Amino acid sequence: MSKIPLTIRGAEKLREELHRLKHEDRPRVIQAIAEAREHGDLKENAEYHAAREQQSFIEGRIQEIEGKLSNAQIIDPAAVQAAPKIVFGATVALEDTDTEETVTYQIVGEDEADIKQHLISVNSPIARALIGKEEGDEAVVQAPGGERTYEIVEVRYE
């Protein structure tokens, strides 16, 4: 299995979620299952079945996070020595050549991506178009809404 790139912040968020699942959510669901069992017949006990389903989801998510963390390549963007080239972890300011609108994105791992926070996945069309480019270059992005051209205004690692 190949390594999954994660920023330090992304790995920490996964660790926090894992801790919450193991130490808060899992015990709560186990208690709910025990209480539902006390209500008698399990075949028609909706509370029991709902709690078991939630337990299954929690256990699956725990395994998923543990797998991601064990296969993670944790990268500190501030320590990346790739400048001026754009690589994973870069924060990039772009200007749309049509609208002259400027937007800034950080290229992060798949699990960290959040467009509202300007965090884009390393596998996104924008990131794929940017990787390997430098300040002053133009990047053509094949987006679902059509082709967009951006000028790379600034590249930084923080």
Curated annotation (Swiss-Prot):
It comes from the Bacteria. It holds the Pfam family GreA_GreB. GO terms for biological process: DNA-templated transcription elongation; regulation of DNA-templated transcription elongation. Keywords: Coiled coil, DNA-binding, Transcription, Transcription regulation. SUPFAM superfamilies: FKBP-like, GreA transcript cleavage protein, N-terminal domain. The keyword Transcription regulation applies. Necessary for efficient RNA polymerase transcription elongation past template-encoded arresting sites. The arresting sites in DNA have the property of trapping a certain fraction of elongating RNA polymerases that pass through, resulting in locked ternary complexes. Cleavage of the nascent transcript by cleavage factors such as GreA or GreB allows the resumption of elongation from the new 3'terminus. GreA releases sequences of 2 to 3 nucleotides. The keyword Transcription regulation applies. One of its GO terms (molecular function) is DNA binding. Residues 53-73 form a coiled coil. InterPro entries: GreA/GreB_C_sf, TF_GreA/GreB_CS, Tscrpt_elong_fac_GreA, Tscrpt_elong_fac_GreA/B, Tscrpt_elong_fac_GreA/B_C, Tscrpt_elong_fac_GreA/B_fam, Tscrpt_elong_fac_GreA/B_N, Tscrpt_elong_fac_GreA/B_N_sf. This is Transcription elongation factor GreA. PANTHER family: TRANSCRIPTION ELONGATION FACTOR GREA. Belongs to the GreA/GreB family.
